[in-house]
């Protein structure tokens, strides 16, 4: 006779129930005379008891660690049982943590109605409870009244002891309490935060969830420290030039190969201006820095004039013979040196003359290394004394030069002149003529 699909499903379910009952039947006793309940993970509980165990209570509820587990034997495999959990006060003290230890700190608060936690597998056969340890891993401890079915309300800084109740249900005697079991190793003090650092370390060591949380926290702390160090490095590099003088020159040394060899420029750049470089380094780089004088100018190696862009630095400069332009064709010739700054208008002991006189000395002029586009009149003579500078005017001259008076060296602050003023003559544009560079 073949079984119908409905009969096959029913027999499959019944076989599953029979296998479930038989799983814990070997530990069962229909008479319940040898009922035995033992604490699971007893050595771990003993470690926490030696440090005075603490359990966190919060408004939303916090689970216990270590988790309360018991091993049960001696139940009727075919009877139905429920497992309940509640907490009772272990003493009549309120506790406080002083100098690294827990001491009684006064009278306890009035006791609240005891809350009972019912194991979610209840009710169930005795065989179900005996086949594996009964774990109360989902119970939560709270300091708020009426927290819910899975939460137990406890007073902070009070010592409690868990109690496990086994109730037989569904029998002819209806519901009756079979037994209650307590374990001294499971006593703890309810706290809102751990007080003992050794206890905290022990919980982190044995709690896999707390260890994972700690590892994540350590990774975040390590990453945060690494980001701070990375952010500080560019800050230190920017501030280094600000707080430490001389960390960067104002003018770095130029490339010695970027100038023509005929100019004879030294490669030291601005190294000799150490007083300017070490005065104060800017915290931010200047948008434009000139590392060397223009290629069209000669560089006087003996001159000591600072290369400053403002004209105010010219007022206090001493006048010496070795800093001025000299011409080999002039009567008063000294050692030829290059001028550090261009001279657009040549001032000499002679009067201003047309360009024909300048062309006569062109060969001497080109020996100085100055380009021809900056030569306007005669080549300058050595400045033994500053001559009188006169600007000629004519009747048709510009109002700027009309009725102009001669500017003596006395008015300009350079001393007295030994040369009498020359007659005023108008310099016309026809007197200017381009010069060609001689073959080198």
UniProtKB/Swiss-Prot annotation:
Positions of the UniProt region annotated as Disordered: 282-303, 393-440
Keywords: Developmental protein, DNA-binding, Nucleus, Transcription, Transcription regulation
Biased composition (Polar residues): 409-440
Coiled coil regions in record: none
Organism encoding this protein: Branchiostoma floridae (Florida lancelet)
Function field: Involved in the transcriptional regulation of genes required for mesoderm formation and differentiation.
Record-annotated DNA-binding residue ranges: 44-215
Taxonomic superkingdom: Eukaryota
A GO CC term assigned to this protein in UniProt: nucleus
Tissues in which the UniProt entry reports expression: Mesoderm and notochord.
Biological process (GO), any one: positive regulation of DNA-templated transcription
A Gene Ontology molecular function term of the record: RNA polymerase II cis-regulatory region sequence-specific DNA binding
Protein name per Swiss-Prot or TrEMBL: T-box transcription factor T homolog 2
Protein localization: Nucleus
